[in-house]
Curated annotation (Swiss-Prot):
InterPro entries: Ub_conjugating_enzyme (IPR050113), UBQ-conjugat_E2_core (IPR000608), UBQ-conjugating_enzyme/RWD (IPR016135). Disulfide bonds: none annotated. This is Ubiquitin-conjugating enzyme E2 32. SUPFAM superfamilies: UBC-like. Accepts the ubiquitin from the E1 complex and catalyzes its covalent attachment to other proteins. The chain crosses the membrane at residues 275-295. Keywords: ATP-binding, Membrane, Nucleotide-binding, Transferase, Transmembrane, Transmembrane helix, Ubl conjugation pathway. Residues 11-166 form the UBC core domain. Its EC number is 2.3.2.23. It holds the Pfam family UQ_con. Pathway: Protein modification; protein ubiquitination. Coiled coil: none annotated. It comes from Arabidopsis thaliana (Mouse-ear cress). It is found in: Membrane.
Length: 309
């Protein structure tokens, strides 16, 4: 790099050149970033997808634009590789980016920002600007594809840096991502099998409940009819190879009906019996009065008295 092009007394230039040397002296296996020769405020970078996520093994290229008063103001970031977490060719909104200068600290560097960017990859976007939220299987597909070729972007000089960075990260990203297992697509079939196995028993339960509910509202001669109907319903729902549940329905329905009616008889109010006895007594009294009136009207009482005298 031709350092003589820039004023080394400029705080921003001095800081950028210092970070370049530090980056070259202490390279990372997780990222690589280099400034352009013609503009040290413009950087190219690539990061590895974080491990144990759908991004693992992916290589994601992007660009960094440093402000003229760096490091007192934050840089802006843009992803060039489709990734399913951030939009491409769009400045992304992060707490370390120029969208939130209030969070930026001058002690942070390009290295700090790239480490933070890797950490942001598997987080929820929450509607932030420049963010997308692809399903995990699509993100894994993009991670696999990202290893094939680096993105084509900018001038030949920039493309040369992009290719160099890609080869470096590819040599470090030894874990080749594989498509995620199709757990979601297999789940419905598994659930369907389980559901088909449970359906007969569930149907029996429905028949039992309907039979019991019906016996609560009918008399003794109707219980037999409802029980027979329950048997027919169970026979149509339950496979022929499982006759026992249908028999069990009949027994349960009949026994339950008898038990419920017995409970009702036991719970009959005592007041009903008292009213019955009172009615009987009243009827007898009325009959006695009517008999006396009849005897009196026919003179039986007078003749009886004359005989005594």
């Amino acid at each position: 790099m031709a350092d003589e092009r820039y004023n080394r007394k400029n705080p921003a230039v001095k800081r950028i050149l210092q970070e370049v040397k530090e980056m070259q002296a202490n390279p990372s296996d997780d990222f690589m970033s280099l400034p352009l020769e013609e503009n040290i405020f413009e950087w190219q970078f690539a990061i590895r997808g974080p491990g144990d996520t759908e991004f693992e093994g992916g290589i994601y290229h992007g660009r960094i634009q440093l402000p003229a008063d760096y490091p007192f103001k934050p840089p802006s970031f843009m992803l060039l590789t489709p990734n399913g977490r951030f939009e491409t060719n769009t400045k992304i909104c992060l707490s370390i980016s120029n969208y939130h200068p209030e969070h930026w600290q001058p002690s942070w560097s390009v290295r700090t920002a790239l480490v933070a960017l890797i950490a942001f990859m598997p987080t929820s976007p929450n509607g932030a600007l420049g963010s997308v939220d692809y399903p995990k299987d699509e993100r894994r597909t993009l991670a696999i594809k990202s290893r094939e070729t680096p993105p084509k972007y900018g001038s030949p000089e920039r493309q040369k840096i992009i290719d160099e960075i890609h080869q470096y990260i590819l040599s470090k990203a030894t874990v080749v991502p594989k498509p995620l297992p199709l757990e979601c697509s297999q789940a419905p079939s598994i659930v369907s099998e389980a559901h088909s196995q449970v359906e007969p028993q569930e149907a029996i339960t429905v028949v039992e409940e309907r039979s019991i509910a019906t016996t609560d509202t009918i008399v003794d001669d109707q219980i037999i009819e409802e029980t027979a109907e329950a048997v027919n319903t169970a026979a149509s729902v339950v496979p022929a190879a499982a006759p026992l549940p249908a028999v069990e329905v009949v027994v349960k329905a009949s026994v339950s009906g008898e038990q419920r009616m017995a409970r009702r008889a036991a719970q009959k109010p005592v007041d009903d019996r008292l009213f019955t006895w009172a009615a009987v007594g009243l009827t007898i009294a009325i009959m006695v009065l009517l008999l006396k009136k009849f005897i009196k009207s026919n003179g039986y009482s007078t003749g009886f008295m004359d005989d005594q005298s």
